Swiss-Prot record:
Pfam families in alphabetical order: CADH_Y-type_LIR, Cadherin
Residues of the signal peptide: 1-25
RNA-binding in keyword set: no
InterPro entries: Cadherin, Cadherin-like_dom, Cadherin-like_sf, Cadherin_CS, Cadherin_Y-type_LIR, Catenin-bd_sf
Name of the protein this chain belongs to: Cadherin-3
Carbohydrate attachment residues: N192, N558
Molecular-function GO terms, alphabetical: calcium ion binding
PROSITE patterns on file: CADHERIN_1, CADHERIN_2
UniProt cross-references to CDD domains, sorted A to Z: Cadherin_repeat
Organism this protein belongs to: Mus musculus (Mouse)
A GO CC annotation given for this chain: adherens junction
Main subcellular location: membrane
Keywords per UniProt: Calcium, Cell adhesion, Cell membrane, Cleavage on pair of basic residues, Glycoprotein, Membrane, Metal-binding, Repeat, Signal, Transmembrane, Transmembrane helix
């Protein structure tokens, strides 16, 4: 196939025009402009002017010629090769028409080297006869960003390019051409100008990642997909091969078991396994250098790294280390750890291909053992599922098989271990036969009467003595013989005792203890089903009634009997002790209630009725009924109505009024006698004394009132330093008071120690200070205190008792006792 352009195409057009002139009377002229985009495709190479050789396909809607405005348009058609052009007319001939204001797309290669400005195409209007036309362009690349890429010569209409184009930035420019006359009037409609930038291979491929990571199981078959790498190229991959990327593997590390373990698809970049032999235990990871080349493998190249991780497959079976075990287990132990079995596995730790699963495959016919996997150590933990019996079987030989959680990837042998378990004999507790014994016993049997025999058996081979005791007997009704296990009545069995008997069953726990070292104890449960006897009479409820003495309504009493049928209902009733003179008792049809009613009038009062009830077993019960008769008609509900008597109200009100009057008088008297207490001392006189009148002999000594607030307030207000007006005191260290103890048991010592500290405290009252006594006036019988003496001489007085008053009176004791010089 050959594209025709230039002179060859022009010759072909001339041939067609010659044929047209032979059949059409009007002359036609043909011209050819190669830039107009007319494309002719001809098969063959011989282009003689007189003959068209090969097949001709006229592409497009026709050929546009711009010579003098005449247009010859040939539709799509063919001319058979070897025929004379004069005998091969086109399929259709259109009449000529004016040229159109159009321009086919302009293709401009990117990265052009110039020179610039470069002429691309020429705009030409057919309305330029007789007037001057001016051309202009608008659109992106002309008068809008990016501005200045294209311009047009105003008068000639040549479209100019001013700089290299970059297809990766802008693939296509859409401009509009305008034609106006000298006076500015538009002579043509705006024409669309498409400028398409054709690609050049100016970009290298780029991988989307520097390092790609993938994984594949070891031992997979060739052809298994591993991962996909991706590279991009900004060049055109649609119309050219510039952006078509081809992938390849440049290198592989390590090269084991050989250097071609993987392959990559040329177009998609998918990496696959090409050879067998992937073994994680030998090579856990491969590093591949992959290439991406544009031009479909013939252009620029870039590289990236692909890391292939080989995942573990269960291609290694676990192995026991060691393969034989021996263990000793006490009998009767449930859940006892017998042995831990250890295995090794070359697969990845803590993976399903590494975690072990154990199974007992032989030697455990009685299902006495179980084995589990330890979650951390992966060991098999063998434990007892049931208690082992030394007397039945003293040794067990178990066979344990190990596999993995994940199935084997390949066929592998399964490891088996042998565990020999020796059962150790222990002293077993006696066993009651049966463990829970149910018997019937009649209530009310005599004390000492045999109830049953409940014994136990010793499972040990040794002949040991068994003794029996009762561990739980809530009502203390039973006793057991320690040697024989005979159980007898120790109290009166009462089926109706709801505190101890539930649903007629009394439960007792019996113990059997052997003579082993150490002794062991077994338990048995004795369930006594107590049968009923007629030991309870019927009882009416309630036992108090209220009834009117006029047109009385019968009072219905319920009858209850703790015994069972046939020792209960139906009941019979009768009144005794002359109660039937005024009263009548009638039992209902069901026999479970009795109605009491008056036969004769009784005045309002309380009466006692003697009601005798008997059950179906003829057991009689006499009950006293308290009946309150009221003066009323019909039915009374709560109590007898009492008439209101107003004579009692007035005395009560009078008494209350008199009491209130008396209380008011007492209150006024107290307020009248109240005196305002005057302060004993003037504020400026800091005296702490009481004034006594010694001359009064009639009424005895009389204490004057004083203001207690003037005295010292105890330990809280003791001064830090006690001064004396006439003598400078000797300072003594203040004693340490013990704080209150938290333990109540120490409160005694706390009081004694703080009492001693208070006795020696110089800051405690009475203070050693100068006291000023009140002046008693002139002519006083005693001019001074020293004149008040009780004897003529101090020798007549005994001051030894002052020594017993403590440290605070030591000075006084020394003065009067002769211990200190005057």
């Amino acid at each position: 196939m050959e594209l025709l352009s230039g002179p060859h195409a022009f010759l072909l057009l001339l041939l067609q025009v010659c044929w047209l002139r032979s059949v059409v009377s009007e002359p036609y002229r043909a011209g050819f402009i190669g830039e107009a985009g007319v494309t002719l495709e001809v098969e063959g190479t011989d282009l003689e002017p007189s003959q068209v050789l090969g097949k001709v396909a006229l592409a497009g809607q026709g050929m546009h010629h711009a010579d003098n405005g005449d247009i010859i348009m040939l539709t799509r058609g063919t001319v058979q090769g070897g025929k004379d052009a004069m005998h091969s007319p086109p399929t259709r001939i259109l009449r000529r028409r004016k040229r159109e204001w159009v321009m086919p797309p302009i293709f401009v290669p990117e990265n052009g080297k110039g020179p610039f400005p470069q002429r691309l195409n020429q705009l030409k209007s057919n309305k330029d006869r007789g007037t001057k036309i001016f051309y202009s362009i608008t659109g992106p690349g002309a008068d809008s960003p990016p501005e200045g890429v294209f311009t047009i010569e105003k008068e000639s209409g040549w479209l100019l390019l001013h700089m290299p184009l970059d297809r990766e930035k802008i693939v296509k420019y859409e401009l509009y051409g305008h034609a106006v006359s000298e006076n500015g009037a538009s002579v043509e409609e705006p024409m669309n100008i498409s400028i398409i930038v054709t690609d050049q291979n100016d970009n290298k491929p780029k991988f989307t990642q520097d390092t790609f990571r993938g994984s594949v199981l070891e031992g997979v078959m060739p052809g298994t997909s591993v991962m996909q790498v991706t590279a991009t190229d900004e060049d055109d991959a649609v119309n050219t091969y510039n952006g078509v990327v081809a992938y390849s593997i440049h290198s592989q590390e390590p090269k084991e078991p050989h250097d071609l373990m993987f392959t990559i698809h040329k177009s998609t970049g998918t990496i696959s396994v090409i050879s067998s032999g992937l073994d994680r235990e030998k090579v856990p990871e491969y590093r591949l250098t992959v290439q991406a080349t544009d031009m479909d493998g013939e252009g620029s190249t870039t590289t990236a790294e692909a890391v292939v991780q080989i995942l573990d497959a269960n291609d290694n079976a676990p192995e026991f280390e060691p393969q034989k075990y021996e263990a000793w287990v006490p009998e009767n132990e449930v859940g006892h750890e017998v042995q831990r079995l250890t295995v090794t596995d070359l697969d990845v730790p803590n993976s399903p291909a590494w975690r072990a699963t154990y199974h007992i495959v032989g030697g455990d016919d009685g299902d006495h053992f179980t084995i589990t996997t330890h979650p951390e150590t992966n060991q098999g933990v063998l434990t007892t599922k049931k208690g082992l019996d030394f007397e039945a079987q003293d040794q067990h030989t178990l066979y344990v098989e190990v596999t993995n959680e994940a199935p084997f990837a390949v066929k592998l042998p399964t490891a088996t271990a042998t565990v020999v378990v020796h059962v150790k004999d222990v002293n077993e507790a006696p066993v009651f036969v049966p463990p829970s014994k149910v018997i019937e016993a009649q209530e009310g049997i005599s004390i000492g009467e045999l109830v049953c025999i409940y014994t136990a058996q010793d499972p040990d081979k040794e002949d040991q003595k068994i003794s029996y005791t009762i561990s739980r007997d809530p009502a203390n009704w039973l006793a057991v013989d320690p040697d024989s296990g005979q159980i007898t009545a120790a109290g009166i069995l009462d089926r109706e005792d709801e505190q101890f008997v539930k649903n007629n069953v009394y439960e007792v726990m019996v113990l059997a203890t052997d003579s082993g070292n150490p002794p062991t104890t077994g338990t048995g449960t004795l369930l006594l089903t107590l049968t009923d006897i007629n030991d309870h009479g019927p009882i009416p409820e309630p036992r108090q009634i209220i009834i009117c003495n006029q047109s009385p309504v019968p009072q219905v009493l319920n009858i209850t009997d703790k015994d069972l049928s046939p020792n209960s209902s139906p009941f019979q009733a009768q009144l005794t002790h002359d109660s039937d003179i005024y009263w009548m008792a009638e039992v209902s049809e069901k026999g479970d209630t009795v109605a009491l009613s008056l036969k004769k009038f009784l005045k309002q009062d309380t009466y006692d009725l003697h009601l005798s009830l008997s059950d179906h077993g003829n057991r009689e019960q006499l009950t006293m009924i308290r009946a309150t008769v009221c003066d009323c008609h019909g039915q009374v509900f709560n109590d007898c109505p009492r008439p209101w008597k107003g004579g009692f109200i007035l005395p009560i009100l009078g008494a209350v009024l008199a009491l209130l009057t008396l209380l008011l008088a007492l209150l006024l008297l107290v307020r009248k006698k109240r005196k305002v207490k005057e302060p004993l001392l003037l504020p400026e006189d800091d005296t702490r004394d009481n004034v006594f009148y010694y001359g009064e002999e009639g009424g005895g000594e009389e204490d004057q009132d004083y203001d207690i607030t003037q005295l010292h307030r105890g330990l809280e207000a003791r001064p830090e330093v006690v001064l004396r007006n006439d003598v400078v005191p000797t300072f003594i260290p203040t004693p340490m008071y013990r704080p209150r103890p938290a333990n109540p048991d120490e409160i005694g010592n706390f009081i004694i120690e703080n009492l001693k500290a208070a006795n020696t405290d110089p800051t405690a009252p009475p203070y050693d200070s100068l006291l000023v006594f009140d002046y008693e006036g002139s002519g006083s019988d005693a001019a001074s205190l020293s004149s008040l003496t009780t004897s003529a001489s101090d020798q007549d007085q005994d001051y030894n008792y002052l020594n017993e008053w403590g440290s605070r009176f030591k000075k006084l004791a020394d003065m009067y006792g002769g211990g200190e010089d005057d």
